[in-house]
Amino acid sequence: MEINSAALSPAEQALRDAALEYHRSPVRGKIAVTPTKPLSNQRDLSLAYSPGVAYACLAIEQDPTLAHDYTARGNLVGVVTNGTAVLGLGDIGPLAGKPVMEGKGCLFQKFCLLYTSPSPRD
């Protein structure tokens, strides 16, 4: 679906401009990876990463079911597209379909408390 700016009504142009600005500012895109734990001092950083993270890794190595306790695995989903059937836009490719995938991620987070992992294939 190609957008011909000349064919847009003033209301459609205003919506297009608002939508593009919405996706661009203040931070690009609609999803982000944010910590669920405080990272306000050296102790927090030592628990979140090295050396503290090793204990979570070793516990999961001994009992893989603990991954649901010590990681986001239990509430993390992937949203992936090959871009061949994106909403009513048709075959626009995976990169152009990324805003739709981010939008789905926002809905999952808002209404299902599930967090999305961006597609590694941009």
Question: Which positions does each model-derived feature cover?
Answer:
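Extended, charged alpha/beta regions that create polyanion-binding interfaces
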Residues: 23-26, 35, 100, 104-114
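Structural signal for hydrophobic packing residues in well-ordered secondary-structure cores
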Residues: 49, 53, 64, 84, ...
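Gly-rich Lys/Arg/Thr-decorated short loops/hinges at beta-loop-alpha junctions or inter-strand turns
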Residues: 41, 81-90, 108-114
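Terminal helix/beta-alpha structural elements that buttress the NAD(P)+-binding lobe
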Residues: 11-38
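Glycine- and acidic-residue-enriched helix-capping/strand-helix junction motifs
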Residues: 87-102
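Conserved small/polar residues in nucleotide/adenosyl-binding loops
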Residues: 115-122
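Short coil/turn connectors at secondary-structure junctions
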Residues: 73-76, 112-114
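An N-cap/entry alpha-helix motif that binds or orients negatively charged groups
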Residues: 28-69
